[in-house]
Swiss-Prot record:
Name the UniProt record assigns to this protein: Peroxisome biogenesis factor 16
Organism: Dictyostelium discoideum
Keywords: Cytoplasm, Peroxisome biogenesis
GO biological process per UniProt: peroxisome organization
Positions with biased composition (Low complexity): 190-224
PANTHER family reported in the protein's UniProt record: PEROXISOMAL MEMBRANE PROTEIN PEX16
Length: 400
């Protein structure tokens, strides 16, 4: 489903200036107390800004698709119409997930530490909230997988630069002005014709008792009036033809400059079985990790290994497909698999790997050595603080 074209002036203004939200989110990130006392408040503001950005990107994608454009200015593909609605819900959940985790954590911290029953209860509530969020995202992605007939999920956002939207909206406004400027000429011609007819009718009424010569002249005037009317209607017909020709030329030019959007999902891929298995493993990997994390605990290696094995199996099934058919990856699939490879770096800062090899290991000793150099001391302190903060929240390192 493609979103409708905007009509509100406020919405058009926001769409044409949506990139400025990035500056607002950067300011929120560096607010005083962002990772301290004001963490929950600032994360709430950040979530609201993300939701607004997601909505504007959703509407911007609809504008591009409705104008038969499927690429933004940097060459990235816009998700097809059957992606948009479900993908919008996924991005909305992702915008709120960290806020809900912080809210559950802050509620737990307000209780007395000596009350172990309350602590366990609040900890269970936090675990349940994270599980529900991960399961909800998995269900939405599974729905998207069904919509794509088992093809790889290659779209995870629908960001559109505001300059692209502004260009399209300005072109549409200019086209409307061109059509409107054609209409006054036809209207003026018709009004002139009506004035001529009214004047001639008055002359006929004033000369009812004239002689036969005047009567013949009036007949000639009637013939002239009919001829003038025919000329005006002919002029109107020519103007309409010019408008239709101009509109057709603009549509042909627009189609030549863009790619015709496919409104229907593609057929199932030839390597349907292996690719679908790979995508299902990719979709449910976060759920598998979190459930095992809740069962075995933070210090156990089982959740870490189970998640990593699931990730590698997913990559193998999705990347290699059916060897016998020798199916080659598309450009979008290759980019998506490369993106998933980069997400493997999150395993370096997850427990218990981080505590074992980084937090108290070689990297920590190396950073402490660099801190002795005065130039690097401040930068190293900031890096370590951010690393410690990012490890305190599950969704910072979940890569889901």
């Amino acid at each position: 489903m493609i979103p409708k074209q905007p009509k509100s002036n406020i919405l058009i203004f926001l769409l044409e200036n949506s990139d400025h939200l990035g500056l607002l989110k950067s300011l929120i990130t560096f607010l005083p107390g962002r990772y301290g006392d004001s963490e929950l408040f600032s994360e709430g503001l950040y979530s609201v800004a993300n939701i607004l950005q997601s909505y504007l990107d959703y509407r911007s994608s609809g504008i591009l698709l409705s104008n038969n454009i499927d690429k933004i200015s940097n060459g990235e593909k816009v998700p097809p119409p059957y992606y948009l609605t479900t993908l919008r819900w996924i991005t909305t959940v992702q915008s709120l997930e960290l806020f809900f985790e912080m809210l559950a954590t802050k509620k737990g911290e307000q209780h007395d530490d000596s009350n172990s029953n309350n602590n366990n209860s609040n900890n269970n509530i936090k675990k349940m909230i994270i599980f529900i969020i991960e399961l909800l995202k998995a269900i939405l992605r599974l729905k998207l997988l069904i919509k794509t007939n088992g093809d790889m999920l290659v779209h995870h956002s629908f960001y559109v630069p505001s300059k692209d939207v502004k260009t399209i909206l300005e072109n549409n406004r200019n086209q409307q002005k061109q059509f409107q400027n054609k209409r006054p000429a036809v209207t003026m011609s018709i009004n002139n014709n009506n004035n001529i007819n009214n004047n001639d009718n008055n002359n006929i009424n004033n000369n009812n008792n004239t002689n036969d010569d005047n009567f013949n002249n009036n007949n000639n005037n009637n013939n002239n009036r009919r001829t003038l009317s025919d000329q005006i209607f002919e002029q109107q017909r020519i103007v309409n033809q010019e408008n239709n020709l101009l509109y057709q030329q603009q549509r042909e030019l627009q189609q030549n400059e863009s790619t015709l959007i496919k409104l229907l999902p593609p057929p199932p891929p030839k390597d349907y079985n292996t690719k679908t298995i790979g995508e299902i493993l990719f979709i449910f990997r976060p759920v598998i990790y979190w459930v095992s994390y809740c069962i075995f605990g933070k210090k156990s290696w089982k959740p870490w290994f189970l998640s990593l094995v699931t990730e590698l199996l997913s990559k193998s099934f999705s990347e290699y497909g059916n060897f016998k058919q020798k199916i080659r990856l598309t450009l979008l699939e290759a980019k998506e698999l490369n993106r998933r490879k980069k997400l493997l770096f999150f395993y370096l800062i997850r427990s218990p790997f981080y505590e074992k090899f980084i937090g108290d290991g070689l990297l920590n000793k190396f950073l402490n050595f660099l801190k002795k150099i005065h130039i690097f001391k401040t930068l190293i302190d900031i890096l370590i603080n951010y690393l410690n903060v990012y490890r305190t929240r599950y969704f910072y390192t979940s890569a889901s």
